[in-house]
Structure formats: C-alpha cells, structure tokens
Regions:
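Flexible glycine-rich beta->alpha loop in the catalytic core of nucleotide-sugar glycosyltransferases
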Residues: 137-138, 185, 192-193
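Preference for short coil/turn "hinge" residues that link or interrupt alpha-helices
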Residues: 130, 142, 164, 186-187
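Flexible, gly/pro- and Lys/Arg-enriched active-site loops
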Residues: 92-98, 137-160
Length: 216
C-alpha cells in the first residue's frame, strides 16, 4: 500500500491513542472511528514497558492508510524513520526542529501542545507548523499534566493565526458547544472514543457539531 502523501491537517476529530492501553478490542474501536471520520491519530508518548514501539505504530499506520488518515508520533520522532508515520506532535517547543525535519527527509505534519502560553502559538507560526492543540479545556484524568486553558486564550490564538486549532482534555459531545465560540477547528480526544460503547456514533456526533459550527 502506498504511503499517504497528503501531509496536511485541517480540523475535525483527532484521536490520541495510549499505546500502553491497546488491546485487540482497541484496534476495532479505532477502525470504527476511522470509518466514521477521524482526521488524525496521534500515538501518545506513554509506552510504559512496551519495547515494540515501531510495530505498534506501523500497525496503526496500516489501519489508518485506507482512510487517508495520518498517524502522528508524540515526541518520539525517531519512530518516523522506522515506520510510515506521517508526523510529530511536540509537547514543548524544540530548538532542533529544522534538524529533525532534515533527518526524517520527507514532508511531515508538525503540531504542538499549547497551554495558556501564546508564545508557544507564536513559535508554531514561526516554525510553519501545521496545527496547534490546547490542553486542557475541561478536567480530564488523561490530561492531568496540562494546565487548564482559558477560552480567551484559544480565541486570542485564533486572532493570531489561521492554522488549525484543536482543543483537548475532557471534551464530550455535550460540552463541546461551550468552546466552539473560541474559533477552534477540531477536538483531540482519548476516552470519549476509546471508552465508548459506540465509538462510531461518538465520532459522528463530534463531526456533526464541528460542521454545524462552520456553517454558522
């Protein structure tokens, strides 16, 4: 199968996968979410004692490729040299981004987590990154390393740039409308999909809400 050559990301539903929690059932949930319209998958840098990192990443790439969905690596950029993954998500600004891009040797998607720090937004703009993500907008057990982000911060970032903005942390279909006025383009979620009885329905619901925002 050919690699995805479309190294862009525009918004939508962005699934963050915890590799330490993957089971056979997890892959089925991911497949159902892909069928319902994921825009990207990120492999979170939470490996615990797992050593077969490249194998897991490539399995996810193989799962996502038929749907044209890119797979991004959180922090462990070396895995892009061992797999067909499509990009990197940084937790913090890197002084070595130009060297990393050169070492990988192909077009990649790059994104970064922002908290309440507009300097990180400016860094993403200066480095011509493809998207930014704000964490955490609501309380979340999986985003407990993030500070809570004020809606005004996201709105300020929207005024600074047109690159896609995602929000993460405790987002559900019920509370997503509360943060839509900030101008975000997508949501990054873990448990809302991975712990759902019907991940396809959850993905569809998120996409429907985001699409309604675009038409208003």
């Amino acid at each position: 199968m050919e690699m995805i050559t479309n190294t862009t990301i525009r918004g939508g539903v962005y699934l963050v996968v915890d590799p330490s929690a993957l089971t056979d059932g997890s892959y089925q949930k991911i497949r159902l979410a892909l069928k319902s319209g994921l825009s990207a998958i990120q492999v979170w840098n939470h490996w615990q004692h797992i050593t077969a990192k490249a194998e897991i990443v490539q399995t996810l790439v193989d799962l996502a490729q038929p749907f044209g969905v890119p797979v991004l690596i959180n922090e462990n950029w070396e895995l892009l040299m061992e797999t067909e993954a499509n990009g990197i998500h940084f937790d913090l600004p890197s002084d070595n981004l130009a060297l990393i891009r050169k070492a990988i040797g192909r077009n990649i998607i790059t994104g970064i987590t922002c908290e309440n720090n507009l300097e990180t937004v400016q860094y993403a703009i200066d480095q011509k990154m493809d998207y930014i993500s704000f964490c955490s907008v609501f309380p979340s057990g999986s985003a407990n390393s993030c500070e809570w982000v004020k809606p005004a911060t996201i709105a300020a970032a929207r005024a600074m740039t047109n690159i896609p903005i995602f929000a993460a942390g405790g987002i559900t279909a019920s509370n997503l409308p509360e943060i839509l006025p900030t101008g975000l383009d997508g949501v990054a979620v873990i448990n809302s999909i991975m712990k759902a009885e019907d991940p396809a329905a959850v993905t569809t619901a998120f996409n429907k809400i985001l699409q309604q925002q675009k038409t208003h």
